[in-house]
Amino acid sequence: MSAISSLVPSRFLTLTAHLVIVITIFWSRENNVLACLPINFTPQQFSSRDTELIIALSVTLGLFAVEYAGFLSGVSMFNKTQSLLSVGAHASATVSLLFFLFEGWDCSLYWWIMSFCSALPAVTEIIIFIAVFGWKRKPL
């Protein structure tokens, strides 16, 4: 099995694992919101932090849509650079978000995880979209 053909399933699996963890955090975000608050908090503070986490998770889901669109349409499926970046970023995000979920990390750390592990691959995916559809280059 060549390296490029093993990158395709690896990319799909890490992307899907990251998506599953984000959805899990979305469903059970109350504990993470409580970890972001001081011991004595007001309902307004809870609502504010909950809204912040909902926005961050929603942006992440939008970035997943971009990356799945490029991957499943075949535009970047066999691009080695994008596949390696995506596998590394989403594997890192999977491990980091597991710690975020189970250790109750602060909510501000989620923005860092999202920017490096979700936004970076999505931006490179958009660049590949522009190169393929705008400049009519081959997807490889």
UniProtKB/Swiss-Prot annotation:
It comes from Xenopus laevis. It is found in: Membrane. Its main location: membrane. It comes from the Eukaryota. GO terms for cellular component: membrane; MKS complex. It is a multi-pass membrane protein. This is Transmembrane protein 107. The chain crosses the membrane at residues 7-27, 53-73, 84-104, 113-133. May play a role in cilia formation and embryonic patterning. Glycans are attached at residue 79. One of its GO terms (biological process) is non-motile cilium assembly. Keywords: Cilium biogenesis/degradation, Developmental protein, Glycoprotein, Membrane, Transmembrane, Transmembrane helix.
